Amino acid sequence: GRDGLNADAWMAYGLQDVVNQRRMIDESPASEEFKQVMRGKLDALLALAEATDCRRVRLLGYFGEQSTPCGNCDNCLNPPAVWDGTDAARKLLSTIYRVQQASGLSFGTGHIMDIVRGKDTGKVKQFGHDKLSTFGVGKDYSEAQLRGVLRQLLATGAVGLQKVMLESGHSFDTLSLTDGSRPVLKGDVPVLLR
């Protein structure tokens, strides 16, 4: 707060916010060096938003300062339950890989989620993705859980976004594997979520 007074701060965001911010950075006319800096800042902000430890420690750490837990932020007052999303992450990454291998195409979040959750949509059938070994492997996870895992994978760079331009001039984002995908797929890097 100001002048030593307490203050409240609220942050609300979702997966689409992450996608939109990454797209704005990628489509910016700025130099690649500047884009890298901006991607790093976005990743730091996402790490703060997804943190399960003291936010003050995280925030001051970003600026090179050390602190002890504040006892005042949401995480200190009500430590979030943390669950291991590694299995869900591996299922999502495997599906992205298998979809690209089977069809030579990349798809967006909704389609990948439909495959993982075993939804028999027209689009899933059209591309034969209901025949993939990963079809329905994540039916035990809620859509919210899988979106949280995907948001974390985007935040850590284990999943990338590729823009696809249509003839109409419209574009959409598809999910792609990155160099950061392999350690998660192999189980070398855990994916812990709140």
What is the meaning of each model-derived region?
Residues 59, 154-167:
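A short, conserved structural fragment
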Residues 1-145, 149, 169-193:
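C-terminal helicase lobe
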